[in-house]
Amino acid sequence: MCQRLCDDFQRAGADCQCIHGDIRQSQREKTMQQYRDGKLAILIATDVASRGIDVDDVDCVINFDVPAENEYYVHRIGRTGRAKRKGVAYSIIGNFPEKAKLDEIAKFSNYQIKTMVLGADGSLTEEEVKVPAPPKRRFR
């Protein structure tokens, strides 16, 4: 998934590289140095490969999953907005258990998490996402 996403970005003309477990450590280190030096606009990393990344100037983090641990999520998005800079984090979720987890993280971290809906045309709109009520049981 990580490599495929990177390939898609590159085909679209984006200056992008990725790091994941199938890439040699020497190549990961080279890619990280390019990113730190500002020679690379977009870095895509798997969860495991991203651990230990220390980069000061990150404008945006996009999460394709929600970590199980609240602290890890806060650490992951904390890469944005360091040194009084502004940053933004997006989390792409596709089911209500992940939405509930984001709500839990918002309470834990005291962050405001805005919910937006991705339309079929690629547009983002602010809409309240309502969790469907559980079916009512009938007792006889």
Question: What are the functions of these language-model segments?
Answer:
Residues M1-V131, P135-R140:
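Conserved helicase RecA-like core
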